Regions:
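Zinc-dependent deaminase
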Residues: 12-41, 58, 84-85, 103-257
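Mobile, glycine- and charge-enriched loop segments
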Residues: 77-103, 253-254
Length: 257
């Protein structure tokens, strides 16, 4: 009987932990959804989303909207209504990226969380930026806040693969893009008077423009630049234009640069 009682007790603990994990992942997925709304507007900063819950419901949420502007945590805390402000002292904030701990273009979010008396923080992944890199988590813990890390870490890392690569590997994140036929034909050798072979459809063209809006720069070879003088701008999607880079053996400037 004692063994049966022990098994029941263990099962209850397992069920409770599973339910907590499901809740954490539910709100972190919402935070990820919010973070994506900043795509194309926050670079070189990362996309970040934040959700605040209390008594089983969301009382505030926000995301980093624009480079140099308020961070996700600030927008989430500011979104809490006056009638719900008293719930902050028993709330949990879910953030896709470790809250910052330094003064940059904005004050540290970790300090704001502490000053707002939020007792629980759930973090998707640590910030690899050298000015943060675990310091935000330590600041929260030293203030007596319960901190959980690594919830949907893979998804949170992938969200900011450009930012993560830059700070973890100290190099740019590079995507190779080209168009070819099913039999691997790309283009013929031609001169400036001849038009290039076109494979792109309206759908793939829109996808390319979406990708352009998500990157800081586009690089092409000097021959492509001379033959086609591509604008490399964002036209079929919203977002800012990337910088144009031409690689060649001699100095070369695109028209309109």
């Amino acid at each position: 009987l004692s063994n049966c009682h022990c098994l029941v007790h263990i099962d209850k603990i397992t069920i409770k932990k599973t339910m907590l994990t499901m809740i954490e992942e539910k709100y972190m997925r919402r935070a990820l959804q919010l973070a994506r709304m900043g795509r194309g507007s926050v670079s070189p900063n990362p996309m970040v989303g934040a959700v605040i819950t209390a008594q089983g419901r969301i009382i505030g949420e926000g995301y980093h909207r624009k480079y140099g502007g308020p961070h996700a945590e600030v927008n989430a805390i500011n979104s809490v209504s006056g009638e719900d402000r008293h719930l902050l002292k028993e709330s949990t904030i879910y953030v896709t990226l470790e809250p910052c701990s330094h003064y940059g273009k904005t004050p540290p979010c970790s300090k704001l969380i502490i000053d707002s008396n939020i007792p629980n923080v759930v973090i998707g992944t640590e910030d690899p930026f050298k000015e943060v890199s675990g310091r935000g988590i330590n600041m929260l813990k030293e203030a007596g806040i319960n901190v959980i890390t690594g919830v949907l870490k893979k998804e949170c890392d992938e969200l900011n693969c450009h930012f993560m690569t830059a700070h973890r590997l100290l190099r740019p994140y590079i995507l190779l893009k080209w168009a070819e036929s099913a039999d691997h034909y790309i283009d013929r050798i031609r001169d400036i008077k001849e038009k290039p072979t076109v494979f792109s459809t309206k759908i793939t063209s829109t996808l390319v423009h979406k990708l352009r809006s998500e990157y800081d720069a586009i690089m092409v070879g000097a021959r492509t630049a001379k033959l086609d003088n591509p604008s490399l701008t964002v036209r079929d999607w919203s977002g800012r234009n990337p910088k144009r880079i031409v690689v060649g053996r001699k100095n070369f400037t695109l028209e309109g640069s």
